[in-house]
Swiss-Prot record:
The active site is at 193 (proton acceptor). It comes from the Eukaryota. Substrate binds at residues 106, 138, 169, 248. SUPFAM superfamilies: LDH C-terminal domain-like, NAD(P)-binding Rossmann-fold domains. Homotetramer. CDD domains: LDH_1 (cd05293). This is L-lactate dehydrogenase B chain. Pathway: Fermentation; pyruvate fermentation to lactate; (S)-lactate from pyruvate: step 1/1. It holds the Pfam family Ldh_1_C.
């Protein structure tokens, strides 16, 4: 006897079993879930996979998202601790990793994350050999290098979320100072995501008007308007949010969805993300730093040759040296 479903539906052709635009998020902590929700909110994938080692938390997050399916345009939301669930992903977002313990050195933290990534990355490649990996876990520049080494992928398919968020914070703070929407305030934060990032004051503009031409002291200690404080706030803002609420997640989630939109829709937008910079600006080691990069469906296809001043280049090189001093001592890569 025919079932209700058979009475209701007449099949014409078999359904496609391989997703067109699948995204995986590895790690369902605060950052991973903010990324997942931001990606769903922008309707960027037809299938979203979540992976974590915490099975109950993972299942709970999956069910919670599935219950909102009516309000989303994502056909399928799946989750499992087995990486088979990630098969055929176009982009894999890695947010997993261990947290820094009190008094722990960065090298020790990075080494512990290397050990985590040694399990994660080969599993990703096994099931999605053609994917692009977007690394979000901190310290992001070093872990992007680690991912590149462990994955064997070409460098254009291993990208760090880098200074996309730092630049967004910069443009927001600039917009507050000027009373103009952040999208009309143009400025770039490059280099290391975090403490040694570089503000490119020479390129800061509104409608093509260079702010440094209007205020030649901008970004220096001589500046009576103290614009240098804006960059200082960018660097300190994450620490402040962590102090207030315990972690940061929403802004990085929006930032990641923004990067995914550029790649999933093949937009060729220029965004400050972490890429391999050996051979650029006199940097001699294999380090990943943020530069203005063109992102497309192929990954990171080009780097914009930004005209940097001597002091900005010196800061970039200093960042590179800092990162290399940690990377060169990493084991098992």
């Amino acid at each position: 006897m025919a079932t209700l479903k058979e009475k209701l539906i007449t099949h014409i052709a078999s359904e496609s079993t391989i997703p067109n635009n699948k995204v995986t998020v590895v790690g369902v902590g605060q950052v991973g879930m903010a990324c997942a929700v931001s990606i769903l909110g922008k309707s960027l994938c037809d299938e979203l996979a979540l992976v974590d080692v915490l099975e109950d938390k993972l299942k709970g997050e999956m069910m919670d998202l599935q219950h909102g399916s009516l309000f989303l345009q994502t056909h399928k939301i799946v989750a499992d601790k087995d990486y088979a669930v990630t098969a055929n992903s176009k982009i894999v977002v890695v947010t997993a990793g261990v947290r820094q313990q009190e008094g722990e050195s960065r090298l020790n933290l990075v080494q512990r994350n290397v050990n985590v990534f040694k399990f994660i990355i080969p599993q990703i490649i096994k099931y999605s050999p053609d994917c692009i990996i977007l690394v979000v876990s901190n310290p992001v520049d070093i872990l992007t290098y680690v991912t590149w080494k462990l994955s064997g992928l070409p460098k254009h398919r291993v990208i760090g979320s880098g200074c996309n968020l730092d630049s967004a914070r910069f443009r927001y703070l600039m917009s507050e100072k000027l009373g103009i929407h952040p999208s009309s305030c143009h400025g770039w934060i490059l280099g290391e995501h975090g403490d040694s990032s570089v503000a490119v004051w020479s390129g800061v503009n509104v409608a093509g008007v260079s702010l440094q031409e209007l205020n030649p002291a901008m970004g220096t200690d001589r500046d009576s308007e103290k614009w240098k404080e804006v960059h200082k706030q960018v660097v300190e803002s994450a620490y402040e949010v962590i102090k207030l609420k315990g972690y940061t997640n929403w802004a990085i989630g929006f930032s990641v969805a923004d990067l995914l939109e550029t790649m999933m829709k093949n937009l060729n937008r220029v965004q400050p993300v972490s890429t391999m910079v050996k051979g650029m600006y006199g940097i001699e080691n294999e380090v990943f730093l943020s530069l203005p990069c063109v992102l497309s469906a192929s990954g990171l296809t080009s780097v914009i040759n930004q005209k940097l001043k001597d002091d900005e280049v010196a800061q970039l090189r200093s960042s590179a040296d800092t990162l290399w001093s940690i990377q060169k001592d990493l084991k098992d890569l």
